[in-house]
Each structure stands twice: as structure tokens, then as C-alpha cells.
């Protein structure tokens, strides 16, 4: 919806969309009827990322948005089964490494470091957060190697918390 509280012009989306600009000029509220989604601030799945699961978001601040700009979106495929990821202190999957299987509200408490410079997502989908307790900028990771922070769309290596995307979407 273009306006808060589900008012104004709206667009219903059922799959990935690389450019939403032709449907609306701003996005201030969203209803997610099913599944999990990543919203992107810019077209072609670029810019700030926002994770949404089923529910109502009457205001962009409810999804931790920095503005009313939503220009593309992707459905996160449901993935059942275990989650496993290796996080690294340095780029190119080097330096201190820690294998993780669970959500982490404080990377510093777990890893004794504020930065993750690379990671290898072995199983499941994950969300990195720039601040502790799942706050701040968000980055969606699917299975694969991320040899530097720019590979997951970040401008720096600051990752202060992360969580698994579970089947409950």
C-alpha cells in the first residue's frame, strides 16, 4: 500500500518482482498473506533489504525500514531441514572460523568479534543483522560461499546478530 494503515493505491504480488516502481511510487504498509519475503529498497534486488514473514505491517518502521522506498521483492523459498553456516574473521573464508547451527542475538558474545568478513552457508537460509538482537540493516543469505561482505550486499563487515529463516513463514 502506498499509505500507512493499508490505505491508498496497492499492488498484490505473488512472486519475485525486479521493479515495483510502475505499480506504486512509495510503500508505507504491507500485508503478507503467506510465506517469507525480502523487500529491497532499489530495483533488481539491490539496496537495503527487509525480511518480512506472514503478518501485517501498518507502517514501514514496523519492518525496520529506513524509508518508504520499496522497489523490488523476492519470495524466500521454504526450506525444511537443518541450518549450518561457517563464519570467518577474514575475507576469502580465512582466519578464525566458527560453525553455527542456531540463531545468535550477539555475534560478539559468540565469536569475540564484531565483524564477519566472509561466510559459507552450508544449509538453510539466514538473515544477518547489523546490530545485536536482530536490529538494523538486514542481509539475506542462501546456501553458497560469500568471500567478502559485499557478496551479501553490505558496505562493511559489521554483523552483530543473525538468525535462521525457519519453516514457520
UniProtKB/Swiss-Prot annotation:
Renumbered residue ranges of the record's region Connecting peptide: 78-82
GO molecular function annotations of the record: structural constituent of eye lens
UniProt family annotation: Belongs to the beta/gamma-crystallin family.
PROSITE patterns: CRYSTALLIN_BETA_GAMMA
UniProt GO BP: lens development in camera-type eye; visual perception
A Pfam family: Crystall
Protein name: Gamma-crystallin 2
Primary role: Crystallins are the dominant structural components of the vertebrate eye lens.
Additional notes on this entry: There are at least four genes coding for non-identical gamma crystallins in this multigene family.
Keywords: Eye lens protein, Repeat
Keyword rRNA processing recorded: no
Domain (Beta/gamma crystallin 'Greek key') ranges: 1-34, 35-77, 83-123, 124-166
